[in-house]
């Protein structure tokens, strides 16, 4: 489980990245596939709306180009109160 503030939201190809830091090779990120973006939006939670918000993400941290969790279900991401 990782908790923190989403610094930026970026899309590269079929993947959306929720970046917790400026350096993607060092800082933590959450990855969301294009297919999952549709599921987030259907649940009323656009990935872009998470920018500058505190979130908690559940999953396995992998080291692929930097530490990250790949989101496979909307329920893995929890928006926390405040910033």
Regions found by a protein language model. Give the residues of each.
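OB-fold single-stranded nucleic acid-binding module
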Residues: 1-83
């Amino acid at each position: 489980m990782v908790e923190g503030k989403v610094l930026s939201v970026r899309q590269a190809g079929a993947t959306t990245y929720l970046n917790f830091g400026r350096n993607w090779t060092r800082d933590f990120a959450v990855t969301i596939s294009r297919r999952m973006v549709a599921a987030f939006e259907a649940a009323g939670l656009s990935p872009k709306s998470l920018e500058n918000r505190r979130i908690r993400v559940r999953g396995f941290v992998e080291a692929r180009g930097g530490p990250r969790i790949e989101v496979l279900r909307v329920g893995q991401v929890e928006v926390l109160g405040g910033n």
